[in-house]
Amino acid sequence: MTASQRTLMVMAGGTGGHVFPGLAVAHRMEAAGWRVVWLGNPAGMEATLVPKHGIPMEYVRFGGLRGKGLKTKLTLPVNLLRACWQSLGALRRVRPDVVLGMGGYITFPAGVMTALSGRPLVLHEQNSIAGLTNKVLAKLAKRVLVAFPGALPHAEWTGNPIRAELARTEPPQARYASRSGPLNVLVVGGSLGAAALNEVVPRALALLAPGERPRVVHQAGVKHIEALKANYEAAGFAAGEGVRLVPFIDDMAAAYAAADLVICRSGAMTVSEIAAVGVAALFVPFPYAVDDHQTTNAAFLADAGAAVLVQQRDLSAELLADWLRGQSRASLAAMAERSRTLAKPEATDEVARVCAKAAGANLEILQ
């Protein structure tokens, strides 16, 4: 690190919904000449993922309380005090000019110690319903940013930082107009898959006449690919009959861009990516998400006519088949165009600019 180089500390962990947007901002700041250090949990996915991106790490051990037993709750004061001490040590070693909190349990002790040490704290909430940690830390932060309007009071709506290739996708009008033939449907359950989609979609397609069926790419989740193959076989589909089954998709930008319709869950990053690309979506929120935030995430697009929201309890093969019969490429293109108008494709740059400004940096460095 040079004497004039500024440092950003990103604190995020636990799930990809926190880590991936943090990485997008981290890379943007590195491109602008900043040093970036990541604060995470040694037991979290970030401990494996972040070093692969060449970003050095500091660690704090701290877990959540939701669904945990009595022992965890009784030891909370000791664990919290230890996490605060570890956070303070990391802050003293790294000496960041600004700290960006992207969520995860470690954000609470690290965020508190950031504020108490007098360093500027910037918070970003990815979901439409803010978690408890960000609700508390928002009172201590210098700037508060949200991906969905209204998630936190007095916050700035920046959108979710996403991968650059998603924001560069060709506009939906041009993509849809260039296609003919059956609709292209992408089914995505996330990296772990979604059992409800894996079960219902094959049966729904079987209810459609051959001439009504779309072409389908169905991402199963690595652990569920064999079960998904069995589901399609049970529904009467032989391999290669207009259906391609994959365990994981590396290039989501290309997959979204090739689709007329995406059938998926409605995690914060999924909703933000779909809007950024501009593609029609049928959202089936995960019914056990904390505070049912996936329903509210999906409603952001659905309420504007930019997507369709179906609760898992209402989803059936018959309902899905009937709905698919009523869709055309033109109707889906209109939905996709509305979705694109609600996107925040410059979110990564905007969050980076806010961090720079909070540190007192010249914004020209991020232009």
From Swiss-Prot:
Annotated keywords: Cell cycle, Cell division, Cell inner membrane, Cell membrane, Cell shape, Cell wall biogenesis/degradation, Glycosyltransferase, Membrane, Peptidoglycan synthesis, Transferase
Gene Ontology molecular function, alphabetical: UDP-N-acetyl-D-glucosamine:N-acetylmuramoyl-L-alanyl-D-glutamyl-meso-2,6-diaminopimelyl-D-alanyl-D-alanine-diphosphoundecaprenol 4-beta-N-acetylglucosaminlytransferase activity; undecaprenyldiphospho-muramoylpentapeptide beta-N-acetylglucosaminyltransferase activity
Principal cellular location given in the protein's record: membrane
Topological relation to the membrane, as annotated: Peripheral membrane protein
Any Gene Ontology biological process: peptidoglycan biosynthetic process
Compartment list: Cell inner membrane
Binding-site residues for UDP-N-acetyl-alpha-D-glucosamine, renumbered to this chain: T15, G16, G17, N127, R163, S191, I249, Q294
This enzyme's EC code(s): 2.4.1.227
Pfam families xref list: Glyco_tran_28_C, Glyco_transf_28
Reaction(s) catalysed (UniProt annotation): di-trans,octa-cis-undecaprenyl diphospho-N-acetyl-alpha-D-muramoyl-L-alanyl-D-glutamyl-meso-2,6-diaminopimeloyl-D-alanyl-D-alanine + UDP-N-acetyl-alpha-D-glucosamine = di-trans,octa-cis-undecaprenyl diphospho-[N-acetyl-alpha-D-glucosaminyl-(1->4)]-N-acetyl-alpha-D-muramoyl-L-alanyl-D-glutamyl-meso-2,6-diaminopimeloyl-D-alanyl-D-alanine + UDP + H(+)
Residues spanning the membrane: none
InterPro entries documented for this protein: GlcNAc_MurG, Glyco_trans_28_C, GlycoTrans_28_N
Classification via SUPFAM superfamilies: UDP-Glycosyltransferase/glycogen phosphorylase (SSF53756)
Classification via Gene3D superfamilies: Glycogen Phosphorylase B
The protein's enzyme class: transferase
Keyword Glycosyltransferase: yes
Pathway noted in the entry: Cell wall biogenesis; peptidoglycan biosynthesis
GO cellular-component term (any): plasma membrane
Family, per entry: Belongs to the glycosyltransferase 28 family. MurG subfamily.
Job of this protein: Cell wall formation. Catalyzes the transfer of a GlcNAc subunit on undecaprenyl-pyrophosphoryl-MurNAc-pentapeptide (lipid intermediate I) to form undecaprenyl-pyrophosphoryl-MurNAc-(pentapeptide)GlcNAc (lipid intermediate II).
HAMAP family per the UniProt record, alphabetical: MurG
Name this polypeptide is given: UDP-N-acetylglucosamine--N-acetylmuramyl-(pentapeptide) pyrophosphoryl-undecaprenol N-acetylglucosamine transferase
